[in-house]
Amino acid sequence: AFFSDANIIKSKVKGALADSPFGQFFSPGLAEGTNVEIVIRPQHVRIDFDRDGKGPLPTVSMGRPARGCVVRARFLGNESLVEFRMDFDNSIFKVTVPNVFLPKVGQPLWLTVPRDRCFVFPAY
């Protein structure tokens, strides 16, 4: 990736906001209808457990949760890399977690992303 390892969600600006499965992201200075990419680094994603098909409640700072199922988990020495197949578009979403975290393949988990750790850029 251009910046570093990152998850990219494509969106479009409407009313100064870019909508995504994780909720809306402020897009100041971008014109209405601009195609954008929401950039989310793997280390900034938070993981929460599934509660009978439900995730954590949405919050202003974390947006709404999006569900994915584990497709691979590896311990990399000082962190774990967990890859999810996301329910919203079947894409692969990468998350890094400090220490050992190795959920079973197929396990559904919920992901949230803190708004202050994500970036919205015009798509080229």
Sequence positions of predicted segments:
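Conserved beta-strand-loop-alpha-helix hinge in the C-terminal portion
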Residues: A1-S4
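Non-catalytic connector elements of ABC transporters
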Residues: A6-Y124
